[in-house]
Regions:
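N-terminal, non-cleaved signal-anchor transmembrane helix
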Residues: 1-59, 63-66, 70
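Interhelical loop and adjacent transmembrane-helix boundary motif
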Residues: 2-7, 37-39, 52-60, 202-241
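Membrane-interfacial helix termini and adjacent extracytoplasmic/periplasmic loops
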Residues: 40, 44, 49, 98, ...
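Transmembrane alpha-helix signature in integral membrane proteins
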Residues: 59-90
Length: 257
């Protein structure tokens, strides 16, 4: 009994240290963003909100937020649809080249981002769409679709195959069975895939930096601000981007219009 209690406390302490290690940099970044001094110093200078005001009044930041929101929501929609289609194909059908099919579907996350970004840049330049928002959406969809596929495929593996067969026996065609049986069963995985792919797209930097052109996203504009200087504006912008929910951004953009 004593050994179990000791092990439990050890695991709790280890978990607490892991969370401290993960969240401490974020916490100190938020603290220093309220510092009036340009450089992070201890003890802190006077309390100020001017860095947040600078970010709020910067039109480039809001343009980047608009671009990031558009890209992330579009990417999440496309990636989730592709992920559902590929997951259902893997679940429903058996064919000779299925291992190759799955290998190609799951390949993008295994490729280094720099290599993928350079390949995407060359491909988009050849197609004549380099630097457009559409190119960012396509690149992010290729990167994130495998994550959606993995989540939805895991959910499909928990479904009884006889459910779909029962729908067919009751007169439903394939599309009706898909709409009334498969999609409702996969709804939690679809929602999870949408949220995950949107978050990955919103935070993705390497590919965005190569293919975005003048359509900068939040990670790209943060790099531009931080390059060559250390500014509390960057820390306030990072903290603000973490707190900006899609609802808040939508309301802000609608008010501007």
């Amino acid at each position: 009994m004593t050994d179990n209690r000791t092990l439990r406390w050890f695991l709790f302490a280890y978990l607490a240290l892991v969370f401290v290690f993960i969240f401490a940099p974020i916490f100190f970044s938020v603290v220093f963003s309220f510092n009036s001094d340009r450089f992070p110093t201890i003890p802190l200078g006077n309390f100020t909100l001017k860095w947040y005001q600078t970010v709020w009044n910067d039109p480039d930041v809001w343009e980047a937020a608009r671009t990031s929101l558009t890209v992330s929501l579009s990417t999440a929609t496309i990636a989730t649809a592709l992920g559902f289609a590929t997951a259902y194909t893997d679940y429903r059908y058996s064919f000779r080249l299925k291992p190759i099919y799955l290998g190609l579907v799951l390949l993008p996350p295994t490729i280094p981002l720099i290599i993928m970004a350079l390949a995407m840049l060359a491909w988009f330049a050849k197609l004549g769409i380099s630097g457009q928002v559409m190119s960012i959406i396509i690149a992010h969809s290729v990167l994130t679709a495998p994550f959606a596929m993995a989540i939805i495929r895991l959910r499909l593996s928990q479904m009884d195959p006889s459910l779909e067969a029962a729908a067919w026996n009751l007169g439903a065609n394939e599309w009706s069975a898909m709409r009334r049986v498969i999609v409702p069963f996969c709804r939690p995985a679809i929602i999870s895939s949408f949220c995950l792919t949107a978050a990955v797209s919103f935070d993705e930097f390497a590919i965005s930096w190569f293919v975005s052109g003048l359509n900068k996203t939040i990670p790209v504009i943060i790099l531009e601000i931080v390059t060559g200087n250390i500014d509390p504006q960057v820390r306030s912008e990072e903290h603000t981007s973490e707190l900006q929910s899609p609802d808040h951004l939508v309301c802000r953009l609608l008010l501007e219009k």
